[in-house]
Amino acid sequence: MKKTASHNQDGEYHQEGLLQLTLEGLIPPNQILVLNLELRTATLFYNVPEGNQTMVEQQHFSPNGMRVLVPLLRAYPKYCLHEVLFASLVSLPLEEAYQQMLEMRALTIRSVRRAVASLPSRLRAFGWQVRSIRGAGYLIEAIPTG
């Protein structure tokens, strides 16, 4: 079986169930976040000067938590639309998710809100929080210090 890997210009690296993100501004430049989509884990690694990596933090997420975490992180530093989160949550193409949200707004928003509500305790370990952008979506950001 051949392993496939791809890079994109936003600092993402994807390889069979692994998603690596640099998240400039959310994590230090010498760290990388690796999402294991199968195990539903997020692991923060520190790149040691000798070329090795040291694990800084790891958290395990619920299935729905991981389904909304991925688009939130991909949207960073911008917010992620409710429609994108709902599409990821229910595994629908964006157009279908948008149509369902038009037809059943309260129900779809509630399911997104419930999935996002599972994130804060896990994200705190990384020093992050999720903020609601009223009527639009959610934003992942660093917890303000001070």
Regions found by a protein language model. Give the residues of each.
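Short boundary/linker motifs that mark transitions into or out of structured domains
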Residues: K2, N8-H60, M66
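Context-gated lysine
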Residues: K2-K3, K78
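DNA-binding patch around the recognition helix
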Residues: L26-T41, P49, Q59-H60, M104-G146
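Short amphipathic alpha-helical recognition elements used for nucleic-acid or partner binding
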Residues: Q53-A97, L119
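Short, positively charged loop/turn segments that connect secondary-structure elements
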Residues: S91-R110
